[in-house]
């Protein structure tokens, strides 16, 4: 068994690939796949967003190369940004 960090990294990879490739490129998330990932894995994030267009905005911000899909590198940017934003909350409540 790996360290906590190795396990966390493996989980991030597995979550991405569990949602990618259901339609189109198996190494990227379509808008529909990104929405499904956010709804199942980050439902608290979506619940906190009062904006009905939250997924569209997230997709636009993440899709750095403008191909209409989110690749693994772009997905990691989302996870890292959310982790930074949540750091104080989790640290203070642990």
Swiss-Prot record:
Ca(2+) 2 binds at residues 63, 65, 67, 69, 74. CDD domains: S-100A1 (cd05025). InterPro entries: EF-hand-dom_pair (IPR011992), EF_Hand_1_Ca_BS (IPR018247), EF_hand_dom (IPR002048), S100-A1 (IPR028486), S100/CaBP7/8-like_CS (IPR001751), S100_Ca-bd_sub (IPR013787). Gene3D superfamilies: EF-hand (1.10.238.10). Signal peptide: none annotated. Ca(2+) 1 binds at residues 28, 33. The modification S-nitrosocysteine is found at residue 86. GO terms for biological process: positive regulation of sprouting angiogenesis; regulation of heart contraction. SUPFAM superfamilies: EF-hand. Keywords: Calcium, Cytoplasm, Metal-binding, Mitochondrion, Repeat, S-nitrosylation, Sarcoplasmic reticulum. It is found in: Cytoplasm; Sarcoplasmic reticulum; Mitochondrion. Residues 13-48, 50-85 form the EF-hand domain. One of its GO terms (molecular function) is calcium ion binding. The modification Blocked amino end (Gly) is found at residue 2. Its main location: cytoplasm. Glutathionylated; glutathionylation increases affinity to calcium about 10-fold. Although predominant among the water-soluble brain proteins, S100 is also found in a variety of other tissues. Dimer of either two alpha chains, or two beta chains, or one alpha and one beta chain. Also forms heterodimers with S100P. Interacts with AGER. Interacts with CAPZA1. Interacts with FKBP4. Interacts with RYR1 and RYR2. Interacts with CACYBP in a calcium-dependent manner. Interacts with PPP5C (via TPR repeats); the interaction is calcium-dependent and modulates PPP5C activity. Interacts with ATP2A2 and PLN in a Ca(2+)-dependent manner. Interacts with mitochondrial F1-ATPase subunits ATP5F1A and ATP5F1B; these interactions increase F1-ATPase activity. Small calcium binding protein that plays important roles in several biological processes such as Ca(2+) homeostasis, chondrocyte biology and cardiomyocyte regulation. In response to an increase in intracellular Ca(2+) levels, binds calcium which triggers conformational changes. These changes allow interactions with specific target proteins and modulate their activity. Able to bind zinc in vitro; the binding sites are different from the calcium binding sites. The physiological relevance of zinc binding is unclear. Physiological concentrations of potassium antagonize the binding of both divalent cations, especially affecting the high-affinity calcium-binding sites. This is Protein S100-A1.
């Amino acid at each position: 068994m790996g360290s906590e960090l190795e396990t966390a990294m493996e989980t991030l990879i597995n979550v991405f690939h569990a949602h990618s490739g259901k339609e189109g490129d198996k190494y990227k998330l379509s808008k529909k796949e990104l929405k499904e990932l956010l709804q199942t894995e980050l439902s608290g994030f979506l619940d906190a967003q009062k904006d009905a267009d939250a997924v569209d905005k997230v997709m636009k911000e993440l899709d750095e190369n403008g191909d209409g899909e989110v690749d693994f590198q772009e997905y990691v940017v989302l996870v890292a940004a959310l982790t930074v934003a949540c750091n104080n909350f989790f640290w203070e409540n642990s």
